[in-house]
Swiss-Prot record:
InterPro entries, alphabetized: G_OBG, GTP-bd, GTP-bd_Obg/CgtA, GTP-bd_prot_GTP1/OBG_C_sf, GTP1-OBG_CS, GTP1_OBG_dom, GTP1_OBG_dom_sf, OBG_GTPase
Coarse class of the protein's main subcellular location: cytoplasm
Pfam hit, one: DUF1967
Protein name, UniProt field: GTPase Obg
Gene name, Swiss-Prot/TrEMBL: obg
GO MF, one annotated term: GTP binding
A Gene Ontology term for the protein's cellular component: cytoplasm
Localization terms from the record: Cytoplasm
Limits of the OCT domain: 345-424
Record text on subunit structure and interactions: Monomer.
Amino acid sequence: MFIDTAKILVKSGNGGNGCISFRREKYVAMGGPNGGDGGNGGSVILVADRNLTTLLDFTYRRKYVADNGEDGGNSKCFGKKGEDLYIKVPIGTVVKDVETGKTMVDLAKEGDSYIVARGGKGGKGNYHFATPTRQAPNFAEPGMPGEERMINLEIKLLADVGLIGFPNVGKSTLLSMVSKAKPKIANYHFTTLKPNLGVVKIEGANAFVMADIPGIIEGASEGVGLGLDFLRHIERTRLLVHVVDISGVEGRNPIEDFKKINEELKNYSVKLWDRPQIVVANKIDMLYDEEVFETFKKEVNKLGFDKVFKISAATRDGVDDLIKEVTRQLSMIPITEMEIPEEERFMPEEKRFTYTIRVEDGVYVVEGSFVDRLLKSVNVNDPDSLRYFHKVLRNKGILDELKEMGIQDEDTVRLNDFEFDFLL
């Protein structure tokens, strides 16, 4: 089972409402408004963490919601900000917006972070709305709703080095010899059904991560078997180590195997085919005809590969020299972020003031989260508050949309339980 993609719902917190309150102190006449601002809602933030290698955790939890901001208080007390929700993901996680299908971010390095849902802004308290002619505003600003979206997570970077080759050529054995990884090893095809990772440490050099990529078969680039899943796992490795079974004990032809694997790489992605590649002839401990290796080496040289490493992963013969070469080449290959064409990048849209208008039995019904929160912060029995309410409806385009829909003088408009007659 491949746990390299996951779809989750993220929702940031709503902003707290501004407070409506007035100073009430002895000997202080007409103390004035002192309602505090609401706190901002918490955001949902993804963070790349080197300690994670799969998206397995997201199969058990699909919804992530940050805290709401608290409402403002009297005496100009600000509401508490909602706690941000941090979600750890593996390095190399690519995040896409489900609705648009566009890439939001590529978390390519340790500690990279991205806000996938920004918390709603807290509303202003009534003290902000005091003017020389409106000294006691009996209204406040509502907090704004948070963002909610479905996102796709996809791992496109599992390791610095990818071990590639047909099934059962010794990739898992090699990984177990050079790291502390303990992959399942057996003598049958598709032993490895998901990438096994191992950290390879060599004295005097930086450690690197090596992945035993599941065996590729013919037609992998066209989706045969688990081919596309396999190829996706090596798309972001910096260096490929191509392992072939030089012994031929299973009746395989190492030259044909080598060509077929490279053909699948090329069909899937030319960039992947151009990736630096170290050729490894494994199982020399079972090789009974040295001429087989020499013939293989000559054919590989013709294809543009100057050197072939001759090893036995089982006995560790030649493995140390191979790892030194891998380390040397990695030191010259920069870690690059995946290029995202500008037109494919996700651009968040402003959806804070969403509402709908419908006509029901001659009544214009305005609905939406913004309308709900606005009504909670308006005193419909106060003239100043109603004037502010009218101003908000005008500024947000609701009144203009009602006119475009053909509303007439004295037609009824309903917002939740509040109704009023429209005047042109």
